[in-house]
Amino acid sequence: MTTLIKNIGLYRNGKVTENQNISLNGKYIKDFPENPKDEDYAEVIDGKGMLAMPGLVNTHTHVAMTLFRSYADDMELMDWLQNKIWPAEDHLDDDIVYWGSMLAFAEMIRGGTTAFCDMYMFMDSCAKAADKAGIRGNLARGLAGISPNAQSGLQENIELFEKWEGAGDGRFHVMLGPHAPYTCPPDYIRQVRDEAMKRGIPIHIHLSETKGEVENCLKEYGKTPITLMNDLGLFELPTLAAHCVHVTDEDIAIMQEKHVRVAHNPGSNLKLASGIAPGVKMRKAGVTVGLGTDGASSNNKLDMFAEMRLASLIHKANTYDPFAITATEAMEMATVDGAKCIGYDDLGKLEKGALADIILVDRS
C-alpha cells in the first residue's frame, strides 16, 4: 500500500527541514516528493504541526518487568537481583508475561519507541504481545547455566528461534540470551556458542555491569568478563553486550576488533549505582553504542527520550567536555546506531529504501 505523509517537519542528519513530504511503499520509504497529489496514494496523513523522526530503538530491556516497576528501589544490583527480583520472577507465568509485555509496548509506542531488544522468560508470550502491538522486536530467552532449567531454557530459546525468526513480516528476530558470566559458567557459554553457530543466531548478554562482577571474574578466571567471553569464542558470533560499565582499554579494543555492539543503559546504571559506562571512549574507539532503558524495575520507565538526555548529560559531566555527546549524537545512539546494535542497516534513518519505522512528534 502506498502512503503519503505530508506537510511535516523532517528530522534528518541532525537538521530539521520544514514543509516536507514522505512517500511510503509498504514498509519502506519510497521518496520525498516535492509536489505530491493525494489521489496518487491509498492513504494520506496530514502531518501539519508534526516532526517526522526515525522510530527509537531500545537496545536492551526486559519488557515484562513493567510489573515490577518501583518494586525494589535503593539497592545495588546483586542485592536487588538475589533478594527481590529473582524470587518475584519465580511467580511469573505465560499470562502474566503477556500482559506485562503489552503494558510495556503501550508505554514504548506512546513514547516513540518502534523497536526493542528483549531478554526474559516466557518469551513466546512476549512475542505474541509484540505481534499484536505491531512493534518490531529482537527476542532472547534469558539463560542461566547455574539454573536447574539451564538445558530446558536453551531448548526454549532454540524453539523461539524456529518459531519467530523472521515472523511478523520480518519484524521479529531471535537471539540466544546467556544472562551473564556470573550465571553462565564457561562450559555453558561454550554450549550456547555451539548451538548459536549451528543456526547462525546472534547473542545478547550482560557484561561488566558492576565493579564487583569484574573483580569476581578476575578472581575466579584471571580475566575480565570481556576477555573471558572472547577467549571462549562467544564473540565469533554477532554479539550485543548490555552495560559494559567497567571495561578496560584492552576490553574496548577487543570489542572493536570483534564488532561487539554495546547497549548503554545510563538510567539503569545510575539507579543501581553500577557506575557510568565509558560511552564516549567506546564510540571514539569505533564501537557501536546504542541506548537502552533496561527493565522498568531498574529504571522505572521505558522512556528513550529520557535516556538520550541522560546519555548526553552524564558524559558531559563525567568528561568535563560539553561536546562529549551532543544532542545529535544522542539521537544517533537511539536510532541508527541502535538499529545497528540489533542487526539492521536499513533502520533508524529517514532515507530512500529504509524501513518506514517513523514517528510523528507533536510540536504544538
Predicted features and spans:
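Active-site gating loops and adjacent loop-to-helix segments of metal-dependent hydrolytic enzymes
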Residues: 67-99, 106, 133-144, 211-238, ...
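Glycine-enriched alpha-helix->loop->beta-strand junction motifs that scaffold or abut catalytic
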Residues: 134-136, 193-201, 234-237, 254-263, ...
